[in-house]
Amino acid sequence: EIIGAEDLVAKRAVNESVAKKILSAAKHWEDKAKATGEDIRKINPIPANMAAGISSLEEKSLGAIAKSGTSPIQDVLKYAEMPKGSGLYFVDSWMSSLSLPLCLTACGATIMLYQMGGGKIAQHPMMPSINPTVVSPFLYLTGNAIAYSRAPDNFDFDASPIMTEGASIPEMGTKLLEHLSAIASGTMTKMETLNYAEQLELYMEGPVL
C-alpha cells in the first residue's frame, strides 16, 4: 500500500531508526513478491483501480498514505503487536482487507474506520461489538457521492458533501467525530444492523493447507 511512495512515509518518522524500519518493511514485501515471480510495481494498478481512475502505482500509494493523515509515525509494529505508547503507528502487515481488521484488533484497536474502495463490503463474525469476544466496531466511510447513493445502507458516513455541496473539511471532520463518539457509546454500525458476516481470515506467511 505504500510501495512507490514509501520515502514520503519515512519522512514522517519520529527518528531515523523508525524511518529505516518503514523503508525496510516496504522492501521486504516487494522482495517477497519478486521471489514468487511477481513484480508489485508492474502488476499495479489492477484493472479495478484503473476503472476507478487510478493511473499508476505511485498514485495508488499516495491515496493510501493520505488516509493516514499528517501525524508523526512513532514506530513500526509487527502483525498483531500492540503499541507501547500513544500516537500514530505503522503496522507492517499484508494489505488484505479481510485480514487487516483482525490484525488491528489484536494490536489493540477498539474501533475502526474503513474508507470503502471499489470492492464489496467485508465484515467478520468476531468483530462486531454485539459479539462478546472481540469488541471492535467497524465503520465504513466514503467520499464518493455516487457510491453512497447506490448503497446508503452500507456506509456509516458520507464525506462527499465536501465536493458536492461545498462543505468544509473541518465541518465534516466534526460530524465524523460526533458519529464516531455515538458508535463508541453503543450505537450500532451499518454492518451490525445488516448482520452481514464473512469467515474470519488470519494472515499467515507462506503456504497454508
Regions found by a protein language model. Give the residues of each.
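Anaerobic metallocofactor- and corrinoid-dependent redox/one-carbon enzyme cores
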Residues: 1-209
